[in-house]
């Protein structure tokens, strides 16, 4: 067999192995052992998924793509997925502790600095982390982030992009849930219509609806309450942050 052909095969297999290389582990933090996964080699990049209250599984595909150039880290935020907590309450579920979790994970993995990519709520957490630990970041990426303060919440309308039929159906099933209908069918219908708010192509809505069913509503509520309690705003810190920042929206 041609030696050049063998070399090409070896190079292909080596690059494929590097991209697909995955390791898992647990990083101790305050009151929780954080489950994490790493992909690829290179400069470290941590992905903070949205929510709050969701595990990191929905971002494994993105992690594998980015692993072609970076060492990508996913982690289950406290109380989600495999980052199990014995008790969840307002003292154990705060933005301050979630920032401490990120620092604990960075130190556990031995990185001096890393790129932080936060999506949706993950962008809010990424901003808050950057405000408190700017030296730990090489760069900050905010993907469809909630912003640098709570201004967005004053005008946010989840149903804005829904059709009239979708909006009516979502509001109907939401009312059913509020009235005490806890059946799996009612929950599935509510998620099915809610998912249409997050996509431009409704063909992708079923995948989003499935993902919405993986969330922990208690964690979601506690963190949003904590954001209100602390008066979340990183405007002052943003003015002095000197690392590269990429904002992705649309």
PLM regions: where:
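Glycine-rich His-Gly loop
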Residues: 47-51, 120, 250
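Alpha/beta-hydrolase
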Residues: 171-236, 242-243
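Short beta-strand/loop motif that positions the catalytic acidic residue
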Residues: 241, 247-250
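Conserved hydrolase catalytic core segment
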Residues: 112-154
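Conserved HGGG/HGGXW glycine-rich cap/lid loop of the alpha/beta-hydrolase fold
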Residues: 29-85, 89
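Bacterial Sec-dependent N-terminal signal peptides
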Residues: 1-23
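Flexible "cap/lid" loop of the alpha/beta hydrolase fold
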Residues: 140-176, 217, 221
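Active-site loop/oxyanion-hole signature of alpha/beta-hydrolase fold enzymes
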Residues: 77-121
